[in-house]
Amino acid sequence: MPMSLNQLFPQAERDLLIRELTLDSRGVRPGDLFLAVPGGRQDGRAHIADALAKGAAAVAYEAEGAGELPPSDAPLIAVKGLAAQLSAVAGRFYGEPSRGLDLIGVTGTNGKTSVSQLVAQALDLLGERCGIVGTLGTGFYGALESGRHTTPDPLAVQATLATLKQAGARAVAMEVSSHGLDQGRVAALGFDIAVFTNLSRDHLDYHGSMEAYAAAKAKLFAWPGLRCRVINLDDDFGRRLAGEEQDSELITYSLTDSSAFLYCREARFGDAGIEAALVTPHGEGLLRSPLLGRFNLSNLLAAVGALLGLGYPLGDILRTLPQLQGPVGRMQRLGGGDKPLVVVDYAHTPDALEKVLEALRPHAAARLLCLFGCGGDRDAGKRPLMAAIAERLADEVLVTDDNPRTEASAAIIADIRKGFAAADKVTFLPSRGEAIAHLIASAAVDDVVLLAGKGHEDYQEIDGVRHPFSDIEQAERALAAWEVPHA
């Protein structure tokens, strides 16, 4: 819906109607407001002339360090600190969509996708239609449209919330990345619930240190107007976060600390999933779930905490849990029965790989086999760490390519190799498709095979090109072929 330019930027010398907002000059159409900000790869101000040529009605640009501007009849508005204001500007344009929603923000190194999808499924079952914004895309559970970033840009976030609200959402479960918090992509949103899963090494190529990474995550828990914080006490940083005084309600959860608001005892992990006694100030209840692994029990507690924070009764929440499924590519089960059990998981950090391998060990009647690689152009420090973890926790390890991006596959594998104490016992096979086929073909019926790193991804990025590739499809093909040699 068009909006007056002066409603967005009162300092504009001339008022006119704005049809849409855009940060990308390539997508400008007549009547749009082009927002020109410096970015990591491109400076939007270098594309002002292009935006004007395509019919931009006006341009707002970052004033600091701006060079000479092209001549224009359209208003050109200089704004100091424009990037930090984008979320608020977009909020005004799209009618402050977060204000009329129960907005649940989920942050942490691992578990964001699982927790947000568990919350969304549970709310749907409880009668509150819930949208999703995150790594697997945006939309409603079972019908997500894929996106490139965990937390979209500030304009896309607000536009997405407006679209979801218009489509009937009364709540939205949003993955909130450290990048998104640090860059102000969610700055003007009205979060009701903030969930913290865990903090471990990741994104140090961007943040520079664990302290900076932690500080970015912590912003969500001091959010203005926040109703409830849901925090994992089994995490060192979580305990620190829970100890900080805030106005919002605090719900803590733990698998080990009986003083937590939500605490599990007598947890049992079997082929049917998870069963545990949930102890809370509201009383005890039986938690049942088809999900696999200890960390998924932690994810379930995070989801229960968010739902309690929204005011749902514990009994109603527990009744939804047996119906909740894990996301595609997150501890996803393939095969099993008269074939090896193959598990596809997105684990691409040392902490996530360790948790997945530990979670799968009780399910392996025989060997636990692990395939992994590391992404190119990303934190190289985690490569040897992941090697050491795989060597310690798996019976057999196969190292392959992940997304090499613009980095040489051989260089990535050489970094990984440094972490093995006995690299001669490890198989190195760069072609991921061949590696998956080889490992599954070598598995026995009682073995568990973990394919780690890519999860839901339907591509492999090599030399900047995304080629169609799916671990799930490759595994299904290998399992079908497994019948022949093992029949």
UniProtKB/Swiss-Prot annotation:
The keyword Cell cycle applies. The keyword ATP-binding applies. A motif (Meso-diaminopimelate recognition motif) lies at residues 402-405. GO terms for cellular component: cytoplasm. Its EC number is 6.3.2.13. GO terms for biological process: cell division; cell wall organization; peptidoglycan biosynthetic process; regulation of cell shape. It catalyses: UDP-N-acetyl-alpha-D-muramoyl-L-alanyl-D-glutamate + meso-2,6-diaminopimelate + ATP = UDP-N-acetyl-alpha-D-muramoyl-L-alanyl-gamma-D-glutamyl-meso-2,6-diaminopimelate + ADP + phosphate + H(+). HAMAP family: MurE. This is UDP-N-acetylmuramoyl-L-alanyl-D-glutamate--2,6-diaminopimelate ligase. The lineage of its organism: Bacteria, Pseudomonadati, Pseudomonadota, Gammaproteobacteria, Pseudomonadales. The gene is murE.
